[in-house]
């Protein structure tokens, strides 16, 4: 059978199921694919195939995740489901799966539990814009008041973590009922997908953001000038445009792009995702180096202080064997750059144990081009000991 071409006609959205252990996240994921498969919009995936999640490595951290994809009438979704709570924490903090929105599953029989709260908090900290609630196991609750109570608790919890608790769609259903083909519960899965289509916003495309390219390598071509190579992170750069070089003391030096090359071919422009070489006018080879970024003038600022949400690897994951304390100074690997920084722990936190997820303040030894949402690894002696993302810039 010929390989299917990736259909670009529908907008693409990344979502996932989050929530407390045994509330039915994986059953719901299987139910979504089963119900949509009947409408020809998905490939059927069994509970077991999703539950036996393969290991993946992202920024040196091993995470178990299952990826499924499906379509609705309006969108193409890539959906992530993780078997264990620790996998969720790692997944959301390291960005192995960037979520544009999430379905939070809560069992009507239990109501919100500690991990329900923890996942909502994590979603807030890593800037997941909106959540949709699926109240599961409603076929096991006869009391309407009990359902209303759980719904009220969920709305309060969402509002507490600065989501729109009043307007967030809450769908009452039964994932197992839908998986077993009960029409009443299949309809609820379709209702859930409609809620995702309308409530979860389309993510801004990388190509529509300002141009930015981290420099990976630099070389000079005799008679033509200096070429900087790298993968364009966001935006578009055209031949003849003015750009700025930032970071590592480049002090915002400006230049003009006189050529864009990809695979030894000349292009008129490079766009997000392309690996290119940019020919820069009037820039000496020693004025630009790996770790700097090239961008449109005035679009990116340098910062040396920020707050971040981080996950610290366990010993079994190749991380530290011992905790670290306040003022710990590891290297931060940001884009293509290793830079030393000092960690300040939250008030009242004496130390951080391997396996912890914590909010820290970081002060780098020199400013680096960075923005909220940017992900990084924490390294010590060349090995990854943690990963995280910037949640707030300070200077």
Swiss-Prot record:
- Which residues take part in binding GTP? 19-26, 81-85, 136-139
Segments of this protein annotated with the region G2: 60-64
Q: Where in the cell is it found?
A: Cytoplasm
Segments traversing the membrane: none
So where does Mg(2+) get bound? 26
Q: Which UniProt keywords apply?
A: Cytoplasm, Elongation factor, GTP-binding, Hydrolase, Magnesium, Metal-binding, Nucleotide-binding, Protein biosynthesis
G1: annotated span: 19-26
Give the reactions, separated by semicolons, that this protein catalyses: GTP + H2O = GDP + phosphate + H(+)
Chain positions covered by the region annotation G4: 136-139
Q: Per the record's keyword annotation, is Acyltransferase included, yes or no?
A: no
Give the Gene Ontology MF terms in alphabetical order.
GTP binding; GTPase activity; translation elongation factor activity
Show the segment(s) annotated as G3: 81-84
Which positions fall inside the tr-type G domain? 10-205
Query: What PANTHER family does the entry give?
Result: ELONGATION FACTOR TU, MITOCHONDRIAL, ELONGATION FACTOR TU-RELATED
Q: Which NCBIfam families match?
A: EF-Tu (TIGR00485), PRK00049.1 (NF000766), PRK12735.1 (NF009372), PRK12736.1 (NF009373), small_GTP (TIGR00231)
> Per its database record, what is this protein's job?
GTP hydrolase that promotes the GTP-dependent binding of aminoacyl-tRNA to the A-site of ribosomes during protein biosynthesis.
| Designated name of the protein | Elongation factor Tu
Lineage of the species this protein comes from: Bacteria, Pseudomonadati, Bacteroidota, Bacteroidia, Bacteroidales
- Gene of this entry: tuf
